[in-house]
């Protein structure tokens, strides 16, 4: 399994898969040059971490 797959399975189990995909779209829209040549798994991981970070802040 690839890293992207593992992250997406984890996001699915946590119920945040849709939010991760939305965050991926937002990241690519914000800075297309930065994410143009970046590995998809790295973008997924960054999006997952962003969503988890927001979720943790909301819980505090």
Describe the predicted segments one by one.
Residues 1-60:
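C-terminal alpha-helical interaction appendages
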């Amino acid at each position: 399994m690839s890293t992207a797959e593992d992250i997406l399975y984890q996001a699915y189990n946590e119920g945040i898969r849709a939010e991760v995909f939305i965050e991926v779209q937002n990241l690519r829209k914000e800075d297309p040059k930065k994410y143009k040549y970046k590995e998809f798994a790295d973008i997924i991981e960054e999006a997952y971490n962003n969503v988890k970070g927001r979720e943790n802040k909301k819980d505090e």
